[in-house]
């Protein structure tokens, strides 16, 4: 299939779509949970369990997204997902029982899997092939501002209206987000199913390495970010230091965009993975040097920002573009399960071993992550030396 020309406005419109979708779904409980608890009497864990349920729904749907993209086209899939997130906000606004609350999060989970990064990036790669790589970087730059925009916006809404009314405002934002997907060209593949191409030993190895690598990174990143306030409090710093996380995340993505084609997916993967153990050692040294805690928050925020780009662009180096949606749909399932499990796992770990003990466990996992990154890069180098054509520039 010949790739389409890339519209200039597409990074802006899809970036705004992602900023809204993340802001009104994933980041929503962080703003509204306290107000919901005060009004409904539901516990904070019960409220956040809705988000965990949504993540599990995302994992369950993952294998089917590639077929949906092929049959319906990326524009329709991402638009439907955005509308479902909008609808879920509307249902939550009228929820008076946890059953309704969880039902709304199931709807949100379906919408999130159809319209957040993974589905959008698969749609862009299907349409534009290797051209999509720079657009993906720009979209993550905009999407990374979701918490910066929607946390203060949610707080401001709560000063003038109830959380239920605020969720209805979020639902309207969801409708705007759905309208932005009209900038994505409508394109579908022929509905006749072709058998998946046979996978060789190197291809299977790439798949296992990628799935394990992203799953472990997701586990550490989600667990660390969820319990970041505990770490900051444990070293005696004000919670406002957590703002450095967002600054690091946005700054790193901006620098990646500026670096351009010189920073290939393989180089970015290696740089990100090798920086992780060093960053956690910086955090562990905070028991002796207080300033290093702030350095850890800033540094790991930067790493977390790059991880999203690595997850999206590395498959372009490992697999053919036409296989991107199908392969990532399956290979990202472990990561999505880890995303759902990591907050609870880290809560248990911090209780059992303390915050610093949990940091040591994370540091050990980052060594494994770094080793996997080296294996991926070496595997691609060996493939090139063997004369196998590269899949990307």
Question: Where does each model-flagged region fall?
Answer:
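Extracytoplasmic
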Residues: 9-44, 61-65, 151, 224-229
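Extracytoplasmic gate region of multi-pass secondary transporters
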Residues: 29-34, 203-257
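Conserved MFS/SLC helix-loop-helix module at the cytosolic interface between two early adjacent transmembrane helices
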Residues: 60-98
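Helix-to-loop junctions at the C-terminal end of transmembrane segments
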Residues: 61-74, 252-265, 350-351
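Cytoplasmic helix-loop-helix junction between adjacent transmembrane helices
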Residues: 105-141, 320
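A late C-terminal transmembrane helix in Major Facilitator Superfamily
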Residues: 147, 318-353
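Symmetry-related core transmembrane helices of the 12-TM Major Facilitator Superfamily/SLC fold
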Residues: 165-183, 358-375
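C-terminal transmembrane helical hairpin of 12-TM major facilitator-type secondary transporters
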Residues: 246-248, 263-314
């Amino acid at each position: 299939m010949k790739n389409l020309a890339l519209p200039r406005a597409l990074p802006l419109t899809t970036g705004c779509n992602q900023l809204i979708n993340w802001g009104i779904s994933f980041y929503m409980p962080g703003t509204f949970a306290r107000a919901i608890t005060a009004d409904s009497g539901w516990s904070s864990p019960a409220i956040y369990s809705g988000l965990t349920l949504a993540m599990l729904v995302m994992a369950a749907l993952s294998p089917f997204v590639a077929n949906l993209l092929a049959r319906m086209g990326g524009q329709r899939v991402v638009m439907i997902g955005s509308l479902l997130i909008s609808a879920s906000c509307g249902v939550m606004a009228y929820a008076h029982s946890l059953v309704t609350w969880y039902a709304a999060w199931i709807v949100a989970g379906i919408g999130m899997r159809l319209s957040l990064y993974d589905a959008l990036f698969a749609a862009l790669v299907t349409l534009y092939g290797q051209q999509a790589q720079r657009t993906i970087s720009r979209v993550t730059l905009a999407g990374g501002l979701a918490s910066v925009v929607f946390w203060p916006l949610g707080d401001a809404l709560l000063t003038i209206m109830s959380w239920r009314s605020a969720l209805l405002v979020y639902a309207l934002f969801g409708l705007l987000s759905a309208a932005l997907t009209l900038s994505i060209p409508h394109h579908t593949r022929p509905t006749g199913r072709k058998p998946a191409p046979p996978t060789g030993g190197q291809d299977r190895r790439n798949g296992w390495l990628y799935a394990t690598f992203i799953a472990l990174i997701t586990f550490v990143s989600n667990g660390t970010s969820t319990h970041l306030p505990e770490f900051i409090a444990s070293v005696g710093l004000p919670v406002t230091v957590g703002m450095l996380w967002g600054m690091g995340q946005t700054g790193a993505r901006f620098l990646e965009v500026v670096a351009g084609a010189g920073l290939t997916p393989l180089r970015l993967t290696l740089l990100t993975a090798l920086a992780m153990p060093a960053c956690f050692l910086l955090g562990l040294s905070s028991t002796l040097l207080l300033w290093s805690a702030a350095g850890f928050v800033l540094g790991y925020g930067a790493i977390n920002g790059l991880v999203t780009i690595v997850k999206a662009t590395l498959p372009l180096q490992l697999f053919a573009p036409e296989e991107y949606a199908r392969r990532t749909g399956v290979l990202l399932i472990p990561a999505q399960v880890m995303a759902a499990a990591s907050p609870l796992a880290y809560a248990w770990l911090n209780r059992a071993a303390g915050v610093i003990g949990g940091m040591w466990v994370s540091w050990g996992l980052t060594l494994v992550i770094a080793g996997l990154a080296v294996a991926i890069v070496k595997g691609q180098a060996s493939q090139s030396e063997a004369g196998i054509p590269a899949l990307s520039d």
